[in-house]
Amino acid sequence: MSAAKSFGDLSQSLAIANETISADIYASCARSATWEALGTQQSRINSKDRLDKCDEIYLPNSQNTEIAGSVLVNYVAAVGNLATENDNGFTPQLNKISDGLGKLDIDENARTAGVKIADFITNLLVTDFRRDNLKVAIVCTDQDIQKYSTELSDFIESSYVKSLLNEEITQIHENYGFYISEVNIRLLKLSNLEDNLQDFSTLQAQQTLLEAEERAEITKVIERKKQGSAYVAAIRSTAEFHRKLKRIFNKDREELSSDQIQKCNKYRSKKESLSFQNTEKEYDVWNQEITTSELKQAKKVTKEYIDKVTPLFNEIQD
């Protein structure tokens, strides 16, 4: 099915975005540390302390964020593989995923959802790799996809885009502010401008250069903020697209019936409860074949999704 194949084709772009943004979590911390103005012994100590903190906290945080993002990357790739019946030997390391998610500051329910996504798709592909299960994969995992995508995107936005990168801008301001103030002090000490015209011109040129360098460095960080925001938007758009596919494949219903949950549980290590579910007979009959109408709707939302996320991925890769 072309819709899900296109969904899967974008997994490579999603993987690049995940690697780029996750790596910059540590890099941003390190850059902030090196922006510490080194005019005193104490400032050198502060810079060293910052770098130590980056190694202790943000290096593993960066690595675990990439692991967290890989849950969605692998899932998106797996959906594409199901659509094209291309078994590429997908074998996510569930223990590594569980351990990595456990070390991130995200909601416990989201951690559980991430592990459940990886667990479900692994069991599905290993035990019953059939294109017919494409609808099963999308319908069964959507609730966890929504929960996990929301928490992951919120985490990246709050901890990276709005925290680390803002701190980096603050450090750049303070760094250049220190050296610009040193130039200003020297300018103020020039008592006779006519006798010190050359010194005045030299100092003014230094100040202008420092201010231009500051703006250039801040512009670099602003571009990284745009890339981070693009990744956040891509995650949210992917989840939105997945929900649309789920509703197309589930007769425009949000909830799953007991019959559907039983089918989903076939691929879950931990089975879900069947209580309080819709048990209407016509809803319980779950046709796993994709109808012509469903295919037409899926193609439409797929085109909308690709048109929406392609510029976002281009922003990250530029």
Residue ranges of model-derived segments:
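Generic alpha-helical secondary structure signal
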Residues: 79, 180-183, 235, 287, ...
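Residue-identity detector for threonine
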Residues: 20, 34, 40, 65, ...
